[in-house]
Amino acid sequence: ADALLYRNDAEFARFLPHIPQPFTKRDAEAFVALNMAEPWDRTPTFAVTLNRKVIGTVNLDVDVDSATAMLGYAIGRTWWGQGIATEAARAAIAWGGETFQLARIWASTDTRNVKSQRVLEKLGMRQESLKVCKHVGREGELVYEVVYGLTRNAIAP
């Protein structure tokens, strides 16, 4: 139910075209079922909670063979600007680095999503490249993503 509340927000989903708008109860149920079905040793997803309420998620998409992982996070708009995304992502990075002995963690975000870029910079990630995204934006526009990365020395807690 909490996922329905924070994900049913056009501004929240602005740079996340895979999240339908409006976000219905059926969408929320599918989101939870999908994340529960993902193998924990490859795609761990954590609920971000505040006062026993789910306000977002943070996840890693681990490639064990290359000892790398993609970081993802999404926090409800009500809680933006409070350092919660940074704190949750930092915890996931430390946990993933130790659990999987990762050599590199990376993340990408829409070039227009300055707030997300700021989170990645606060995590110590450095901009590595710019790429054309494989999906289009909500308005059918071409999307460019900036890729940030963190190597083993910076992953250690």
Predicted regions and their residues:
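A short helix-loop-beta-strand connector motif used in the catalytic cores of GNAT acetyltransferases and
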Residues: 33-47, 56
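Conserved GNAT-fold acetyl-CoA-binding loop/helix
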Residues: 12-34
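A short hydrophobic/aromatic micro-motif that marks alpha-helical segments and, especially, helix-coil
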Residues: 23-24, 39, 139, 155
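Acyl-donor (CoA/ACP) binding surface of acyl/acetyltransferases
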Residues: 1, 5-11, 47-157
